[in-house]
Design a protein with these regions (language model features):
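Bacterial N-terminal signal peptides that target proteins for export
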Residues: 2-15
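Immediate post-signal-peptide N-terminus of mature secreted/exported proteins
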Residues: 29-96
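Amphipathic alpha-helical coiled-coil segments
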Residues: 94-106, 143-161, 198-210
Length: 222
């Protein structure tokens, strides 16, 4: 099952309601303005959204592992109830698909606030009167963008790695649905090793992305 994501961790209940309304109506400038009034800036929002994207990937990782385990149990148990097997695998496929969608949604939220943060940062470089401070801030911006791009690239690798797993899973669930016989189980057995490899690649990419996210969060909090 996909874990319900937490709200941005440091926002009061009242602020959550207000901000949720602003998000729904698409008023990003008003949203940021309201957040800043309670001491929460784009940098803070970015950290929180990266944490949520990281957690969504961790949840998805567990879901895909569970799906593989369920897949394996279906093909190894003798005299498997085919209808029951279909129901179990279909449930795991749906859970995995929702987990993948949640990861993508969280990544989009990260990209949205990051784009706004970096645009604001770059625009405000022109406000400096002290050249040394301006240069230091510009270097910090470039460095932060570079580390962000590396982290985001690892997140997108996760997205790409989920697609072939979901396609393989969906194809086999559909085949089982319309062929509730021994031939269907034989087909699942032939697909298992390939699915396992794809999920192993996915898990590795997720671990890399989670590590990169943690490092990026640590760097921003310094």
């Amino acid at each position: 099952m996909v874990t319900t994501r937490k709200p941005e961790r440091f926002i009061s209940y009242f602020v959550i309601i207000t901000i949720s309304f602003l998000l729904i109506t698409g008023c990003s400038k008003t949203y940021y303005s309201a957040m800043e009034k309670v001491g929460i800036h784009k940098r803070d929002i970015l950290v929180d959204r990266v944490e949520n994207a990281r957690d969504a990937q961790a949840d998805a990782q567990e879901q895909f592992k569970n799906a593989l385990e369920q897949f394996g149990s279906v093909i190894t148990v003798e005299n498997t109830d085919l209808k029951d097997a279909y129901e179990k695998l279909n449930a795991e496929y749906k859970g995995s698909n929702e987990a993948a969608k949640e990861v993508s949604r969280r990544i989009e939220k990260v990209e949205s606030v990051a784009d706004d943060l970096f645009a604001e940062w770059e625009n405000e470089l022109g406000l400096y009167k002290n050249k040394a401070l301006q240069d230091a801030s510009a270097r910090n911006l470039i460095d932060t963008q570079k580390r962000y791009d590396e982290m985001l690239a690892s997140m997108h690798r996760v997205e790409k790695s989920m697609d072939p797993v979901l396609r393989t899973f969906r194809d086999n669930v559909l085949f089982l649905k319309h062929n509730l016989n021994a031939q269907a189980i034989g087909s699942l057995r032939s697909e298992f090793s390939g699915l396992k490899v794809k999920i192993e690649v996915l898990v590795k990419n997720m671990n890399d992305a989670i590590t990169n996210s943690n490092q990026f969060i640590e760097d921003l909090n310094q």
